[in-house]
């Protein structure tokens, strides 16, 4: 089934200048970029986006990291886009990620792990709406 999902290329990947390589992974695996923008998250936006993690011990570090530099936010579309994106990203901890996944190839740590991807179709819908107006899609 054709779906849309949200992907964020995080500040560590932008600093390494691997944005193009990451986008190529998506496109060469059947995911089309239907909307994209580069921005610098404010603390408030990062806190709102990651509100589900507010009570977790890593929340403060996550917010500091996500506002430490620009990010690239994209809507990816394709067959089973949510699951495909998750597979391409690999495990959250790059040390556990399979060889050939984005995190195994480009991430440094569980915190600086290169990419974010929606974990469900419902969250994809909400996350896309957080960054993109319907007219932009």
UniProtKB/Swiss-Prot annotation:
CDD domains: NDPk_I. Its main location: cytoplasm. One of its GO terms (molecular function) is metal ion binding. SMART domains: NDK. One of its GO terms (cellular component) is cytoplasm. Its EC number is 2.7.4.6. The active site is at residue 116. Belongs to the NDK family. This is Nucleoside diphosphate kinase.
